[in-house]
Swiss-Prot record:
Tissue-specific expression: In cystoblasts and/or very early cystocytes in testis (at protein level); expression levels are regulated by mei-P26. In cystoblasts and/or very early cystocytes in ovary. Expressed in the gut; expression levels increase with age.
Keyword Ubl conjugation among UniProt keywords: yes
GO biological process: cell competition in a multicellular organism; cystoblast division; female germ-line stem cell asymmetric division; fusome organization; gamete generation; germ-line stem cell division; germ-line stem cell population maintenance; germarium-derived female germ-line cyst formation
Quaternary structure, from the entry: Interacts (via central region) with ubiquitin. Interacts (via C-terminus) with otu (via OTU domain); the interaction enhances otu aggregation into amyloid-like structures and enhances its deubiquitinase activity. Together with otu interacts with CycA/cyclin-A (via C-terminus); the interaction stabilizes CycA by promoting and enhancing otu dependent deubiquitination of CycA. Together with otu interacts with Traf6. Part of a complex composed of at least tut, bam and bgcn; complex formation does not require RNA.
Keyword Cell cycle set for record: yes
Organism of origin: Drosophila melanogaster
Lineage: Eukaryota, Metazoa, Ecdysozoa, Arthropoda, Hexapoda
Outcome reported for the amino acid change (mutating residue 239 to S): In strain: fs(3)Neo61, Wpg1, Wpg10, Wpg16, Wpg2, Wpg3, Zim10, Zim18, Zim32 and Zim35
Chain residue ranges for the region called Required for interaction with ubiquitin: 201-250
Domain notes: May possess a C-terminal PEST sequence (rich in Pro, Glu, Ser and Thr) targeting it for degradation and rapid protein turnover.
Protein name, as recorded: Protein bag of marbles
Origin superkingdom: Eukaryota
Post-translational modification: Ubiquitinated (C-terminal region).
GO cellular component, as recorded: cytoplasm; fusome; spectrosome
């Protein structure tokens, strides 16, 4: 292929191009005339082989043209660029193939009867073109994966806002579900805490979200549940009012703000907010739905803040005021006892050496085994004797415990009581007569 850079002015390009084409036409005409004036013995052939000879002569002319074009050089270096597809050029550009078809379809026949590029060469070039397309596609896909996600790309795949559901009604249902789960599972608030305990054997039903797409009904159920939760927090707060009024005042302000925020939902209970298959009908319904979504997101934060503040205040008052002195002393004694037991076990784990007296007794009376065993388990046996209730159940401790001397049986009467009964004094007043005294009538 002849490639030259176009560096001449625009005014001379057309003239130079016409001049080059004229030279090429003259040269081609001379070559064709030279082939026609050859020896007729070389050009004549039999009738049965006319098609093959015509194709051979044509292919010979084309091959000669191709060789001449390879040796052709223009006179002007500044001539415009010319490209000949299918020739042995330095840079081959992608072209349309007529002798290769995809998916096994038959190839089209050329009109000229001969081709500038052979069949295997065309197949090879087209395979290279297909491979180049695939490599370019994979490279572009890698570049797309490296690009950051933008809002426009999210809108193209149907995600709006901060990756929420596009349908406003479905977003509201997800918020209702999360609030019900938060109140029931995380905060432990359900119908079991709000129902009276008159029916002990009637198990409470788990408070779940209603199975309905009616937004107004869902909001009414949630408001009732949140109001009960607010009453429970108020009851817990009022029980600790006399302990610390400053902390009580802080929690009280928070609960009052929570109650005033909950009043905003009562205004949304007035409109019907109808929807058909999850789609709001009018613009007013869409506005109320968006406002309810914002309020529900804020309601979740109010619930968490109120529960956390009241729970911490109640826990602190329990530690400071509700635990009596006896409970505190018992807790301290248990800790001290556990520390002593752990220290005794650590000392028991340490290896002890045998003294000279113990060694003499073991050798003289052949008691080496028992003495060594006692030395190894000395600390453990000491802890066992000092605190048997730690290692044995109460029934075993009662059996093995020391018998109290001078125990008095309450069933047998004592001698002092018998003496008191014998020396009992006679009352000074006469006994009372229960008989009836007759009266005389006058």
């Amino acid at each position: 292929m002849l490639n030259a850079r176009d560096v001449c002015p625009e005014g001379n390009d057309d003239q130079q191009l016409d001049h080059n084409f004229k030279q090429m036409e003259e040269h081609l005409a001379l070559m064709v005339e030279g082939n026609e004036n050859e020896d007729p013995r070389k050009a004549t052939c039999e009738y049965e082989d006319t098609n093959e000879d015509g194709a051979t002569c044509t292919s010979g002319v084309l091959s000669e043209i191709q060789e001449n074009f390879g040796r052709l050089r223009l006179c002007d270096v500044t001539a415009p660029l010319l490209e000949f597809h299918g020739l042995d050029c330095l840079q081959q550009i992608q072209k349309r193939s007529r002798h290769f078809a995809f998916d096994g379809s038959p190839a089209k026949k050329s009109r000229s009867g001969g081709v500038l590029v052979t069949g295997p060469k065309q197949k090879q070039l087209q395979k290279e073109n297909v491979w180049n397309r695939k490599s370019k596609g994979s490279a572009s896909a890698d570049n797309i994966e490296k690009l950051p996600i933008t809002i426009e790309k999210l809108h193209m795949i149907g995600l709006h806002g901060d990756c929420l559901e596009h349908n406003a009604v479905l977003r509201l249902m997800n918020l209702f579900r999360s609030l019900h789960d938060h109140l029931t599972a995380d905060l432990g608030f359900s119908r079991q805490n709000s129902m009276p305990s008159d029916y002990l054997f009637d198990m409470p039903v788990k408070s779940t979200m209603p199975k309905s797409l009616n937004v107004r009904y869902q909001l009414q159920v949630l408001c009732t549940k949140v109001e009960r939760f607010l009453v429970q927090q108020r009851r817990t707060l009022e029980a600790n009012r006399h302990f610390d009024f400053e902390k009580y005042d802080e929690c009280d302000k928070l609960l009052k703000g929570f109650a005033s925020y909950l009043d905003n939902f009562k205004l949304l209970l007035k409109p019907k907010m109808r929807n058909r298959n999850g789609n709001s009908g009018s613009n007013a319904d869409k506005f109320h739905t968006q406002r309810m979504e914002r309020l529900l997101i804020g309601l979740r934060d109010w619930i968490k803040a109120a529960h956390l503040s009241v729970h911490v205040f109640n826990w602190e008052m329990d530690l400071e005021h509700r635990y009596s002195g006896a409970m505190t002393e018992s807790h301290k004694s248990l800790n001290e006892r556990a520390i002593l037991l752990s220290g005794a076990e650590l000392r028991a784990a340490e290896a002890r050496g045998i003294s000279a007296e113990d060694l003499f007794i073991a050798q003289r009376y052949k008691l080496g085994g028992p003495i060594y065993c006692v030395l190894e388990q000395h600390e453990f046996l000491s802890a066992l004797i000092a605190n048997p209730e730690t290692y044995f159940p109460p029934s075993v401790v009662a059996i093995c415990g020391p018998q109290k001397l001078g125990a008095v049986s309450m069933e047998q009467p004592s001698a002092s009581e018998e003496e008191f009964e014998e020396t009992e004094e006679v009352p000074s007043s006469p006994p009372r007569h229960t008989g009836r005294v007759p009266r005389f009538r006058s």
